[in-house]
């Protein structure tokens, strides 16, 4: 019996990490399904990604971009806007994992909302861990959710937040070439 598909929401889908996530999901379509995507201003790219992924929920945080995109949304897509829209996506009932790849502090409230809803959180925004690492980890523990660091820098911060000594755990770190 094959495991069920992981349903993923990508907050920051038009950035490099978001685009890479969509590519991986397409390559592993038997195991990963993108169900929601969000961006700040890239309305045309977001609409293209909706068509590519088949995601049925989307958000643009920039009001002007959201207004432009609202008339071009594919049929049946639930369309949200603003920070509240990010929170709506992060707490979609059907989501298993929420990837936060939003730059800066804008991802904090959606990250905490996802964890409070019991969603596993993949963190590609180190600001969230630096700013509110203890709150993130406590919220995850309270709701039996996992926090998954996406790259080496976040993994190092995550290990510090876990409070484990280096001899207690061995961790594989993925290094990216720039």
Locate each region found by the language model:
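Residue-level signal for inorganic ion chemistry
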Residues: 14, 50, 98, 118, ...
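Beta-loop-alpha module in the N-terminal Rossmann-like domain of NAD(P)-dependent dehydrogenases
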Residues: 81-113
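Short glycine/serine/threonine-rich phosphate/pyrophosphate-binding segments
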Residues: 16-21, 45, 105-111, 123-124, ...
């Amino acid at each position: 019996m094959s495991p069920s598909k992981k349903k993923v929401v990508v907050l920051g889908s038009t950035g490099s990490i978001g685009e890479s996530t969509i590519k991986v999901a397409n390559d592993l379509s038997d195991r990963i399904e993108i169900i929601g995507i969000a961006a700040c201003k890239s309305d045309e790219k977001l609409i293209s990604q909706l068509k590519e992924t088949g995601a049925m929920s989307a958000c643009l945080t920039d009001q002007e971009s959201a207004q432009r995109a609202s008339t071009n949304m594919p049929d049946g897509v639930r369309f949200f806007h603003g920070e509240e829209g990010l929170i709506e996506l992060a707490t979609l009932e059907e989501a298993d994992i929420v990837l936060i790849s939003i730059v800066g502090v804008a991802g904090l409230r959606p990250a905490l909302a996802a964890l409070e809803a019991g969603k596993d959180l993949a963190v590609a925004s180190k600001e969230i861990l630096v700013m509110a690492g203890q709150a993130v980890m406590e919220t995850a523990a309270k709701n039996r959710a996992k926090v998954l660091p996406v790259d080496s820098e976040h993994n190092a911060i995550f290990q510090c937040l876990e409070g484990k000594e280096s001899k207690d755990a061995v961790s594989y770190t993925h290094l990216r070439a720039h």
